[in-house]
Amino acid sequence: MKKKGGRKILGFMVKEEKEENRGSVEFQVFSFTNKIRRLASHLELHKKDFSSERGLRILLGKRRRLLAYLAKKNRVRYKKLISQLNIREQ
């Protein structure tokens, strides 16, 4: 992972970000994954932060729904995305 502008960006997403393709399902899942990882590390330190825990559950649900949509529409892109983001298949 590279650090760019205060955000972590995977190499394969840099190209898409430059093209302003922020509405794609892949970019949205990538963005949610970064937020989820950041919140998870926050919750390891602050175990009683229940509002952040709720936010994490909401983000997980949004990402799950987007992944289900992508898996239904294009299985190849779905498999590629989950392998690049290193998230397990659901």
Swiss-Prot record:
Record-linked PROSITE patterns: RIBOSOMAL_S15
CDD domains membership: Ribosomal_S15p_S13e
UniProt-listed InterPro entries: Ribosomal_uS15 (IPR000589), Ribosomal_uS15_bac-type (IPR005290), uS15_NS1_RNA-bd_sf (IPR009068)
GO biological process, one term: translation
Quaternary data: Part of the 30S ribosomal subunit.
An MF annotation (GO) of this entry: structural constituent of ribosome
Keyword Ligase: no
Keywords assigned by UniProt, alphabetized: Chloroplast, Plastid, Ribonucleoprotein, Ribosomal protein
Record family assignment: Belongs to the universal ribosomal protein uS15 family.
Keyword Transport: no
HAMAP family: Ribosomal_uS15_B (MF_01343_B)
Official protein name in the record: Small ribosomal subunit protein uS15c
Gene Ontology annotations for the cellular component aspect, listed alphabetically: chloroplast; ribonucleoprotein complex; ribosome
UniProt xrefs under Pfam families: Ribosomal_S15
Annotated compartments: Plastid, Chloroplast
